């Protein structure tokens, strides 16, 4: 649901915001941080505008993985989650992520609310009991989830594959289909064993989910994806057998709530804890008739839980559903999946040991949009953009003019030299607010930096450093520099959701109270400021390289209990930049093709269907993942490069007969490679 920025009024909006709960079995890394920084920026914007916006989160503290991790570390699960929670809170605080309440799912509030949601759904007839067969570890005396079973893929015969899908060939299967399965917990051969489990009757909510997923509460890409699930809704297993770290289900001794039942209820529990402390009404936000706004920020990997199970469970329990769920993509580094061997699997603490959190907050903001596209952290671009935008543009305004104000008495003039420039910056405020509201942070940053460019051009044209040497020009210099400081102040207000610490330093320099969005309507005239001190240092690529090196060193060597699987061997080869022979390269046949027709693909988030004219080779049908970057009408008539001898691939939407070459990390940052004019369809690319 997209909401236009609401004009500031005397009646603030009541907003509750959550981020997905980080799992309490390991440290925060940069892939996690994208979501928390995105959410924090949006929340800070709302608060800066005077809204009553509450941001809660918690550690996801239950499950088999935490129980086993605690056992591995020689501590109790309670000790394990307490230490991890402290580490998480420290990392979030140092990245300036400001929760109103940070809690744990292992809490009395979460137990009570989980039992309430379960019992209400049970009373309404939405809980089933079914006897099923599962794999069981006879050595550990426990049932095994799919991801705790490994073996040889039944399709491609790759070893050491998980019990639900093969990472080498992509095949999906059941754990029972694995060849030579073994428990990744003990190494024992699992056996099949019957067990009676509890299920949430999700198919009963099909009509509700069809309506709700198309109500505007989800991004279009997410809503389209969830339709695939809705076509085949199945009862959802919500119980696990002992031994298990979590909450035992009342009336079912030895059975525990599955972590994905009590984890989202953790949002409610953290808010309940906040309400008890602050004297707020829980029902005002979660009751069926609540008029408060409720937003969940999540990653695209958990949209099924939040977009299907969660609203259905809430409805079954007589509670309200979210106003909207905002999903984001995965983080890549330098165009590739985060890699421990390359040092790009960067922990939050390792980053903080080398670089300012403000750099990452700004870079995330500068590239984030409201879409679900993956996010590439290109480290060279990261350094260049921070240095250019923040140091070279924003801070430069104050550094070039602040000391001239001090030189001529330290007080800003009562009249400005260029009111047209100042009004231009003020009038941009509503547009920037609208971008923030719609999570189009990248557009907001581009607008702000364009204004900073205008200010720097103005300063360069006026050259106060030259005028200051001329006798009798003091008041003119002061008016020029006062104009620049007023523009700087406005830009700081607009950037405050992204850079709260820099804003605080700027407020100290300007000697003003903490700025709010409403302050953008006023000017700073006849006001004394402090001596300018550097507000931000430049990114040094040596710091970045040192961070990457430390990320490599901090990665423990993998256990050698099993031979390397095929996927790992392939990854190692890629890490070593393995070369190929010219004969290998010549096997790939590249041809010039012209896009005869381009069209959207119904039900596909990323694909366009291209009909390509390949000269004497005839026409080819190709599905290309370029929808985020190109409209169909932009492509028709365009020359492209086609991999012409790629085996046809059967896809859900049809047969793809080749691949179009493109550059870039993906999403809306992708660029089709196009031959020079003169090339003709069918020509071979050499």
UniProtKB/Swiss-Prot annotation:
Please indicate the residue ranges that the annotation assigns to the motif 'KMSKS' region.
Answer: 337-341
Sequence positions that bind Zn(2+): 153, 156, 166, 169
Q: Write down the chemical reaction(s) this protein catalyses.
A: tRNA(Met) + L-methionine + ATP = L-methionyl-tRNA(Met) + AMP + diphosphate
Which prosthetic group or cofactor does it need?
A: Zn(2+)
Query: Which PANTHER family does the entry link to?
Result: METHIONINE--TRNA LIGASE (PTHR45765), METHIONINE--TRNA LIGASE, CYTOPLASMIC (PTHR45765:SF1)
Q: Which family does it belong to?
A: Belongs to the class-I aminoacyl-tRNA synthetase family. MetG type 1 subfamily.
The name this protein carries in UniProt is Methionine--tRNA ligase
Q: Which organism is it from?
A: Alcanivorax borkumensis (strain ATCC 700651 / DSM 11573 / NCIMB 13689 / SK2)
Lineage summary: Bacteria, Pseudomonadati, Pseudomonadota, Gammaproteobacteria, Oceanospirillales
């Amino acid at each position: 649901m997209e909401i236009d920025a609401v004009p500031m009024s005397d009646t603030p909006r009541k907003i509750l915001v959550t981020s997905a709960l980080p799992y309490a079995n390991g440290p925060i890394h940069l892939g996690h941080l994208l979501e928390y920084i995105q959410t924090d920026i949006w929340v800070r914007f709302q608060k800066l505008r005077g809204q009553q916006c509450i941001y809660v989160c918690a550690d996801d503290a239950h499950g088999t993985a935490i129980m086993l991790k605690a056992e591995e570390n020689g501590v109790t699960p309670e000790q394990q989650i307490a230490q991890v929670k402290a580490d998480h809170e420290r990392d979030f605080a140092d990245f300036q992520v400001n929760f109103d309440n940070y809690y744990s799912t292992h809490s009395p509030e979460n137990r009570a609310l989980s039992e309430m949601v379960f019992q209400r759904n049970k009373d309404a007839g939405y809980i089933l009991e079914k006897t099923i067969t599962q794999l069981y570890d006879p050595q550990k005396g426990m049932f095994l989830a799919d991801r705790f079973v490994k073996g040889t893929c039944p399709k491609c015969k790759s070893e050491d594959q998980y019990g639900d899908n093969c990472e080498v060939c992509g095949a999906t299967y059941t754990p029972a289909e694995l060849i030579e399965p073994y428990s990744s917990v003990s190494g024992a051969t699992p056996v099949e064993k019957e067990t009676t489990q509890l299920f949430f009757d999700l198919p009963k909510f099909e009509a509700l989910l069809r309506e709700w997923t198309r109500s505007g509460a989800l991004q279009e890409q997410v809503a389209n994806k969830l339709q695939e699930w809705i076509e085949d809704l199945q009862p959802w297993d919500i119980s696990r057998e002992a031994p298990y770290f979590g909450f035992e289900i009342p009336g079912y001794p030895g059975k525990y709530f599955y972590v994905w039942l009590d984890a989202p209820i953790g949002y409610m529990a953290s808010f309940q804890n906040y309400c008890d402390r602050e004297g707020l009404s829980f029902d005002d936000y979660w009751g069926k008739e609540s008029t408060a706004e409720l937003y969940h920020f999540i990653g695209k990997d958990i949209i099924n839980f939040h977009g299907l199970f969660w609203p259905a469970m809430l409805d079954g329990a007589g509670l309200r559903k979210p106003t909207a769920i905002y999903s984001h993509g995965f983080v890549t580094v330098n165009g590739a999946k985060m890699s421990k061997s390359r040092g790009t699997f960067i922990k939050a603490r390792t980053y903080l040991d080398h670089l300012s959190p403000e750099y990452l907050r700004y870079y995330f903001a500068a590239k984030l949009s409201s879409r679900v596209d993956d996010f590439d952290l290109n480290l060279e671009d990261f350094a260049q953009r921070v240095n250019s935008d923040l140091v070279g543009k924003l801070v430069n305004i104050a550094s070039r003019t602040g000391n001239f104000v001090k030189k001529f008495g330290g007080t800003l003039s009562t009249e400005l030299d260029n009111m047209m420039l100042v009004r231009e910056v003020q009038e941009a405020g509503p547009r920037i607010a609208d971008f923030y509201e719609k999570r189009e942070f990248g557009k907001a940053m581009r607008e702000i930096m364009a204004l900073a460019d205008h200010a720097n051009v103005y300063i360069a044209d006026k050259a106060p450093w030259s005028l200051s040497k001329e006798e009798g020009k003091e008041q003119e210099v002061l008016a020029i520099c006062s104009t620049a400081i007023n523009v700087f102040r406005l830009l700081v207000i607009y950037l405050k959701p992204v850079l709260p610490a820099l804003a605080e330093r700027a407020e100290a320099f300007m000697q003003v109270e903490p700025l709010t969005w409403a302050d953008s309507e006023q000017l700073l005239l006849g006001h004394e400021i402090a001596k300018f001190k550097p507000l931000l240092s430049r990114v040094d690529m040596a710091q970045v390289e040192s961070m990457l090196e430390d990320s490599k060193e901090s990665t423990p060597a993998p256990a050698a209990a099993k031979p390397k699987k095929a996927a790992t061997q392939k990854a190692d080869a890629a890490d070593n930049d393995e070369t190929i022979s010219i004969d290998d390269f010549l096997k790939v046949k590249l041809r010039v093709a012209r896009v005869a027709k381009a069209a959207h693909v119904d039900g596909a988030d990323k694909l366009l269907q291209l009909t390509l004219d390949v000269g004497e080779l005839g026409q080819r049908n190709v599905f290309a993942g370029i929808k985020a970057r190109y409209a169909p009408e932009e492509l028709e008539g365009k020359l492209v490069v086609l991999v012409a001898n790629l085996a046809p691939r059967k896809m859900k939407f049809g047969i793809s007969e080749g691949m179009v070459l493109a550059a870039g990390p993906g999403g809306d940052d992708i660029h089709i490679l196009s031959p020079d004019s003169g090339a003709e369809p069918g020509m071979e690319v050499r």
